[in-house]
Amino acid sequence: MSFSPVSPSQFPSVTKLQVDSVTFDPSVKSPASSNPLFLGGAGVRGLDIQGKFVIFTVIGVYLESNAVPSLSVKWKGKTTEELSESVPFFREIVTGAFEKFIKVTMKLPLTGQQYSEKVTENCVAIWKSLGIYTDCEAKAVEKFLEIFKEETFPPGSSILFALSPTGSLTVAFSRDDSIPETGIAVIENKLLAEAVLESIIGKNGVSPGTRLSIAERLAKLMTKNKVEEDASNHSIDEKLAKEN
């Protein structure tokens, strides 16, 4: 099923989010396409270490505007709780035919090797659980690791991923809060692109907070979209009634 592009007047109206002193703007331009994307949700990634929750990164997930009508077909009217607990809902976000963008901002310093090895480990686990790990994915993992090998990420720097509907994964880096106009590398592997996002917001994703934030914001946006659809259909029905 395809959806026509959303006009600027239909671009989702959302607020910025501040998560652990990191601010995510309500919209950004993708370094892969220059398309405007809206903030779907944001949260932290951390671990309990000796009884203390330590935050490593703060993550924001942006979506193309046609994600709202696309997801509304099946999910409008669902509550935040229903969406947050739904594996199929987040699979549909991961695999949907709309652009996604992920901004991962460091709270603690990480080397590129540390970050990329953990991400690819999670991706491989997802593929093996789905029975879809092939030589193509193994080569994509090698390229991913190579991109990050010499990098270091101090606090405040960001790793950026743009996922195109056709399946390419554009990688970019930022040393501050800015988003570069272009990426530094592109990996043409749809399963890797999807797995990077799924490793964050999927069933066993590393950021339950981001998952909940997306569920909450999309539940509201889909309800708003439904109200606008109903109003539009009502006005069409009225017009047809007058003509008849």
From Swiss-Prot:
Q: What else is known?
A: Part of the biosynthetic pathway for all classes of flavonoids, a large class of secondary plant metabolites, many of which are brightly colored.
Instruction: Tell me which UniProt keywords the record has, alphabetically.
Output: Flavonoid biosynthesis, Isomerase
Alphabetized GO MF terms? chalcone isomerase activity
Read off the SUPFAM superfamilies from this record. Chalcone isomerase
Name of protein:
Chalcone--flavanone isomerase
Task: Show the Pfam families listed in the entry.
Answer: Chalcone
Q: Which organism is it from?
A: Arabidopsis lyrata subsp. petraea (Northern rock-cress)
Q: What class of enzyme is it?
A: isomerase
Can the keyword Isomerase be found in this entry's annotation?
yes
